[in-house]
Amino acid sequence: MLVLGVVSVNILNGKAEIFTQPEMVLVKAGSFQMGDESGELWEGTRPVHQVILNYNFWIGKYEVTFAEYDIFCEESGKPPANDQGWGREERPVVNVTWRDAIAYCNWLSEKENFQPAYNEAGELLDFNGNVTTDITRVDGYRLPTEAEWEYAASGGHEAVPIPPRFLFSGSDDIDEVAWYFENSGDEMIFTGTPLTVDYSSHGAAKIQGKSTQPVGQKKPNELGIYDMSGNVWEWCHDWYGEYTVGEKVNPIGADFGHLRVMRGGSWIFGANDCRVGNRLYRPPHEKIFRLGFRFARTEME
């Protein structure tokens, strides 16, 4: 059985509370070429540019599961996320908005007595609770920046070979590391009309045969991180913006926008969509059956 963390006991308001600390992987500071010039990927992955991350950070070893998210929902009074009829437990949570994801991160921070990373407006907070754009000063759990996500998916400080990096997170053979359209189940059957499918509310009654899979079943990447290609797309912190030329240091995305970045591809997408250099976006209020998240945290000195 998959174990996602270690159990500790916290004393809150005089009451003993059992809490499962999440399993995370340390990613050490470094630089990499962000983006992908391949003609097989869309223009939004270009131009390739140098990114420097001059700090260490932690990132979730696994995508957040229903088992973990359900505890948050029970304690916070939020309605549970829809599992599409596929089952819960160790499957990655889906049908969560960007704001649901950052609320989970703040809840997790409070569990471990860290300064929450977000205010109600979704702005980053430093370790004193002040709004900041300096990711190195954010104490609590948060969504990974898009740069952190791609660096970690590419193998981070353990990346081999350098260059070139693997096409997918941990391998050039997608079947080794990812659940995607070709291996996520039997032939897909639409029971609704495909041309009128509303993917924002797409349910198990309208699609059968393929689905998400329990986390951690495929080969991990060089850092020991699972499912960064395929299974579910993952929310990132960043507002979506077009890439520009020139070196970037500790980027956190566009200054403002109306679309948040998502990364990694999913069980219902093709191989190219699961490439580490690929990127897409969705409005932060959307709940989608192919989109979940994992969390990150800056290593404090």
Language-model regions: role of each:
Residues 27, 33, 37-38, 87, ...:
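Functional-site microenvironments in short loops/helix caps that host divalent-cation chemistry
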